[in-house]
Swiss-Prot record:
Enzyme class per UniProt: lyase
Coiled-coil region list: none
Subunit structure: Homotetramer.
Protein name according to UniProt: Fumarate hydratase class II
Taxonomic lineage: Bacteria, Pseudomonadati, Pseudomonadota, Betaproteobacteria, Nitrosomonadales
Keyword flag Phosphoprotein: no
Key words of the record: Cytoplasm, Lyase, Tricarboxylic acid cycle
Marked site positions, Important for catalytic activity: E331
Organism: Nitrosomonas europaea (strain ATCC 19718 / CIP 103999 / KCTC 2705 / NBRC 14298)
Region (Disordered): 120-141
PROSITE patterns: FUMARATE_LYASES
Pathway annotation: Carbohydrate metabolism; tricarboxylic acid cycle; (S)-malate from fumarate: step 1/1
Length: 462
C-alpha cells in the first residue's frame, strides 16, 4: 500500500499520508507552520464539529444540500463529537489568524469521512466536497468565531462553574464550622482587632459568589454567534434564514441558548465578548490567589509561623529537611492564577488587533481563553479536594495569639479615649506586660472594668 496519496486544492497537488482523513489544505498548513507543537484545543475541534453538523442539517432543511450528503456529513460529525478521529486534527495554534486552516481541516476530514460513508474511497472520487458541501453557506471568518464562542460557553458551563461552586460549598461549610472560633485579625500583615475564623472564611465565600455572578453576566454576549455573516458580515452566499436557523440548531444540540448575533460585522471584526469574559477569569484568578495565599500564611509553621489552621499532609515537603510539609496546593493555585493573568494580557492584545472587517488573532485568543478556563477549573477542583476540604482550626495557637494581641485595647477607645488606649498598648509592648496589667498600672481602668470592656467575643459581633 502506498504511503501517500495525491490531494488537490486551488493551488495544485499535495502529497498527503494515505491513511489520513485530512486533505490538501491541512497538509499545506502542516508543511508551512511547524511552530511549537501546541495543537488547536480539543474543545475547539469539538465545537467546530458541532457547527458543521448544525450547518449540514439546516442546509438540508432549506433545500440546499442533498439528503444523502447531509446525512453523511452529520454522521461523520457525530463521530468526531464522540471522540473518534482525534488524530486527524494535527494543526498548531500558530497559523493563519482567522483559523481558516483549522476550519478547512474539519471540512476536509468530514468530507473524506462522509465520502467513505457514501461508499467512496478515502481521498479519491470525492463524493462530498469540503467547500461546496461541508462549508456550504459559510466562511472561516464566521465559522471560527462561532466555534470560539461555543467552546468558551461549554468550558465555563461544563467545567469552570461546577468546580467553583464545589469550592464555594466547601469554604461555606468551613465558615459555619469555624463560626465560634474567635481569632485575631490582621491588616497590613500586623495584628488587628478580633473576628471569628468563620467570618474570615465567609469573605472567601462572598468573593466566589461575586466571581460566579460575574461569570453569569459575561455569558449573554458569548451566546451570540457569528455564523451567517460569511466573509465580512454581509451574509454573502448564504440563505437569508440560515443564520437564525443554524443558531437555533446549535442551541438544540448543545443545550445552551445560543442566538444569532444581531450585528455580524462586530461578531467577525471584534472579540469583545471573549476579552470581557476573560476579564472575569482574571478576576477569578485574583480571588483564588487571595484565598490560596491566606491559607498558606495561616497554615505557616508549624512552630515558628502563624499556624492558626492545619492543612492536609499530602506529600513530603522537602528533599533535605525531614518532616517538612509544604502548602503545595496553594502554590499550584497561585502559579496557575499568574498564568491566567498572563493569558489576559495576550487576549487583550489579541482583541485589540481587529483590522477593518476581521480580527486575525482568533487562534491566540481561544487558545489562551480555554487554557485559562481549564487551569481555573482544575486548580479549584484540586485545591478543594486536596486542601480546603481537610482544613482544620488549630484552636490552641489561635487562643495563644488572641491572648497576646495588643489590638484588643481598641475595645477601650469608647471608654477612655484613643490616646490613653494607645498608651496602654505601648506600655504593654515595651515592658512585656499584658494589656490588663498595663491598663491597671497606668490607673486608667480597674480590673473589673477591663474584664467587662475587653471581651474578644463581643468584639466580633456584627
Amino acid at each position: 500500500m502506498d504511503q501517500y496519496r495525491e490531494e488537490h486544492d486551488a493551488i495544485g497537488t499535495v502529497q498527503v499520508p494515505a491513511s489520513a482523513l485530512w486533505g490538501a489544505q491541512t497538509q499545506r498548513s502542516l508543511n508551512n507552520f511547524n511552530i511549537s507543537g501546541e495543537r488547536m484545543p480539543s474543545a475547539l475541534i469539538h465545537a467546530l464539529a458541532l457547527v458543521k453538523r448544525a450547518a449540514a442539517s439546516v442546509n438540508h432543511d432549506l433545500g440546499l444540500l442533498d439528503e444523502n450528503i447531509a446525512r453523511a456529513i452529520i454522521t461523520a460529525a457525530d463521530e468526531v463529537l464522540a471522540g473518534e478521529h482525534a488524530g486527524e486534527f494535527p494543526l498548531v495554534v500558530w497559523q493563519t489568524g482567522s483559523g481558516t486552516q483549522t476550519n478547512m481541516n474539519m471540512n476536509e476530514v468530514l468530507a473524506n469521512r462522509a465520502s467513505e460513508i457514501l461508499g467512496g474511497t478515502r481521498g479519491k472520487g470525492r463524493k462530498v466536497h469540503p467547500n461546496d458541501h461541508v462549508n456550504k453557506g459559510q466562511s472561516s471568518n464566521d465559522v471560527f468565531p462561532t466555534a470560539m464562542h461555543i467552546a468558551a460557553v461549554e468550558a465555563i458551563r461544563n467545567r469552570l462553574i461546577p468546580a467553583l461552586e464545589a469550592l464555594r460549598k466547601t469554604l461555606s461549610s468551613k465558615s459555619a464550622a469555624f463560626s465560634d472560633i474567635v481569632k485575631i485579625g490582621r491588616t497590613h500583615l500586623q495584628d488587628a482587632t478580633p473576628l471569628t475564623l468563620g467570618q474570615e472564611f465567609s469573605g472567601y465565600v462572598s468573593q466566589l459568589d461575586h466571581g460566579l455572578a460575574h461569570l453569569e453576566s459575561a455569558l449573554p454576549h458569548l451566546l451570540e454567534l457569528a455564523l451567517g455573516g460569511t466573509a465580512v458580515g454581509t451574509g454573502l452566499n448564504t440563505h437569508p434564514e440560515f443564520a437564525r436557523r443554524v443558531a437555533a440548531e446549535i442551541a438544540r444540540l448543545s443545550g445552551y441558548p445560543f442566538i444569532t448575533a444581531a450585528n455580524k460585522f462586530e461578531a467577525l471584526a471584534a472579540h469583545d465578548a471573549l476579552v470581557h469574559a476573560h476579564g472575569v477569569l482574571k478576576t477569578l484568578a485574583a480571588i483564588l490567589i487571595k484565598i490560596a495565599n491566606d491559607v498558606r500564611w495561616l497554615a505557616s509553621g508549624p512552630r515558628c509561623g502563624i499556624g492558626e489552621i492545619l492543612i492536609p499532609e499530602n506529600e513530603p515537603g522537602s528533599s533535605i529537611m525531614p518532616g517538612k510539609v509544604n502548602p503545595t496546593q496553594s502554590e499550584a493555585v497561585v502559579m496557575l492564577a499568574c498564568q491566567v493573568m498572563g493569558n489576559d494580557v495576550a487576549i487583550n492584545l489579541g482583541g485589540a488587533m481587529g483590522n477593518f472587517e476581521l480580527n486575525t488573532m482568533k487562534p491566540l485568543i481561544i487558545h489562551n481563553f480555554l487554557q485559562s478556563t481549564r487551569l481555573l477549573a482544575d486548580g479549584a477542583e484540586s485545591f478543594n479536594t486536596h486542601c480546603a476540604a481537610g482544613i482544620t482550626a488549630n484552636t490552641v495557637r489561635i487562643k495563644q495569639h488572641l491572648q497576646e494581641s495588643l489590638m484588643l485595647v481598641t475595645a477601650l477607645n469608647p471608654h477612655i479615649g484613643y490616646d490613653k488606649a494607645a498608651e496602654i498598648a505601648k506600655k504593654a509592648h515595651h515592658e512585656m506586660l499584658t494589656l490588663k496589667e498595663a491598663a491597671i498600672r497606668l490607673g486608667y481602668v480597674t480590673a473589673e472594668q477591663f474584664d467587662v470592656w475587653v471581651d474578644p467575643q463581643k468584639m466580633t459581633e456584627v
